Amino acid sequence: MIKEKLTIIGAGLAGCEAAWQAAGRGVAVTLHEMKPEKYSPAHHLPGLAELVCSNSLRGESLENAVGLLKEELRRLGSLFMEAALATRVPAGGALAVDRGLFSAFITDKIENHPLIEVVHGEVAEIPADGTVIVASGPLTSDALAASIGKYTGDYLYFYDAIAPIVTSDSIDLSKAFRASRYGKGDGDDYLNCPLDEAEYKAFIAALLAAEKVAAKEFEKVVHFEGCMPIEEMAERGLDTLRFGPMKPVGLIDPRTGIEPHAVVQLRQENREGTLFNLVGFQTKLTYPEQQRIFRTIPGLGKAEFVRLGSMHRNTFINAPQLLLSTFQLKREPRILFAGQITGVEGYVESAASGFLAGLNGARLAKGEALIVPPSVTALGALVNHITSAPAKHFQPMNINYGLFPDLAGRVKKKEKRAKLAERALTELDGWMNTL
């Protein structure tokens, strides 16, 4: 008879990863998910581990810290990475997935694990006893948020914006061209809609004059830089978008032989290639304004939008003030947190925090010593930031090489990232032997 038990609230990326890791270590898991009885404003699929903002898990190269984090998770036996590799779609140098297949893959694995029981329905209170992982996500329900507040005190709010999706057969291929930046991947994984200078200026002017969805007065709007609405970026200056999501660098229009003034990139959304999302085009414009303005983009004049952009509230705790490096709550160590509610930002980071919370949740339930990954690994760097950053100005953060400890000695700039990755994977391999 299994005595060790673990309760996990939330079956998103972090909750599912935590459940999988804990169950794999012999701990019985009760995984609570409020869907399909109740949906957040941004979720639509009935399955577990739903991807909301984008279908991209970002770059695969170890030149990017997120690529290193994915490689670490893959080596550690992450369910998230297993699902991602099994359901990937073409995306140049990035790892992108068919989000429907991705959710179905993880749902099947979780529901068929003998030590995991999935309970559907909203959890309004953190259980009063036992080991608990709170992985309720950035869209935590009001009732549960109130319960969390009893343990954490004040928590912060910010908004992410969701990008639109169009059907591939509604894209005018006589105006758009296929190419990946610098020819990465298969070289034609993205559709690109080029804009000349006049078209770009008209587009910016339309964005600045467009009607937006108003935020409620009691909610403070704080945008995370990695998911900022395009109209907010446009307000920063004429060329801000041209140096951001609309940058033309590395993209040559085959009809002109030169780089366009600006480019809107469309990334394949599903395996069949029938849907494409507008890369970096998160927005809080009203639906009519989105359709009007985005159809002025060359190639999208008759675009069929299967999903328009929208805004939703995100909730996260002040992790440096509240959490230990083991993801335990300082004032009540039987409670752990995981996922975006901790202030990690991004799919991969959420899964990574779930991996570590699941590992330590299982150890806590079994009475074993808890562990923290080496600080030189991507996992360790992420943990260190989340739990050690200045609490006064704490904001969500993606993994990046700026969070890693410096290398010993002098290293050429162009070699630094490769050396950081090499050091991380060497340390990770040694750490894995202790698990």
From Swiss-Prot:
Under the heading PANTHER family, the entry gives: GLUCOSE INHIBITED DIVISION PROTEIN A, METHYLENETETRAHYDROFOLATE--TRNA-(URACIL-5-)-METHYLTRANSFERASE TRMFO
Q: Which protein family is it in?
A: Belongs to the MnmG family. TrmFO subfamily.
Mainly localized where?
cytoplasm
| Annotated GO biological process | tRNA methylation; tRNA wobble uridine modification
> Where does the signal sequence lie?
none
For this protein, what is any one GO molecular function term?
tRNA (uracil(54)-C5)-methyltransferase activity, 5,10-methylenetetrahydrofolate-dependent
Annotated EC: 2.1.1.74
Localization in the cell: Cytoplasm
Which positions in this protein are listed as binding FAD?
Answer: G10, A11, G12, L13, A14, G15
The cofactors required by this protein are: FAD
Question: InterPro entries attached here?
Answer: FAD/NAD-bd_sf, MnmG-rel, MnmG_N, TrmFO
Q: Which GO terms describe its cellular component?
A: cytosol
For this entry, the protein name equals Methylenetetrahydrofolate--tRNA-(uracil-5-)-methyltransferase TrmFO
Q: Name the Pfam families for this protein.
A: GIDA
Recorded catalytic activity of this chain's protein = uridine(54) in tRNA + (6R)-5,10-methylene-5,6,7,8-tetrahydrofolate + NADH + H(+) = 5-methyluridine(54) in tRNA + (6S)-5,6,7,8-tetrahydrofolate + NAD(+); uridine(54) in tRNA + (6R)-5,10-methylene-5,6,7,8-tetrahydrofolate + NADPH + H(+) = 5-methyluridine(54) in tRNA + (6S)-5,6,7,8-tetrahydrofolate + NADP(+)
**What role is this protein assigned?**
Catalyzes the folate-dependent formation of 5-methyl-uridine at position 54 (M-5-U54) in all tRNAs.
Q: Which UniProt keywords apply?
A: Cytoplasm, FAD, Flavoprotein, Methyltransferase, NAD, NADP, Transferase, tRNA processing
Q: Domain of life, per the record?
A: Bacteria
